[in-house]
Amino acid sequence: SDDILVLNAKDLKGLDYKMSKCCNPVFGDDVFGFVTRTDGIKIHRMSCPNAARLLEMYPYRIQRVRWADTPTSGTFQASLRVITSIEPFIINQIMDVVNTFRTTMRQFNVNENQRNGTYDISMKLSVPSNMELDKVISQIKTLKNIVKVVRQ
């Protein structure tokens, strides 16, 4: 059907939907809904690793969705992976960037890879929208010694 579910960060009365954990969609992402058997509608990013399989194998369980016109006061979880050369203060610099924006750090893990001289950093952030997340990503990319920044 052509019914489009309109999403915002607050719960809709009577409609059970959740942001999918595999791709953590945030306000403004290209998304679709997948009607699960037992867990309501799960919202996935179009770029989700599972998206192609779900769209191909279960087209009858796909729900078209779009975001409300403006973000609500809620926040969304987002995961980033940052690869950087091992340098003094680089972790502080990354933290400073995150704190510059309307984001909250939820988790921050650093694995040191001495063999290739890099830090492999994974972090979880609460963000109001993908626009704010994009600002964080592009600002981290401007730091010296950053090898790669990807959203997970």
Identify the role of each PLM range:
Residues S1-I91, R102, R106-N116, M123-K124, ...:
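N-terminal non-catalytic structural scaffold regions of very large proteins
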Residues K144-V147:
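Catalytic cores of nucleotide-enabled group-transfer and carboxylate-activating enzymes in metabolic
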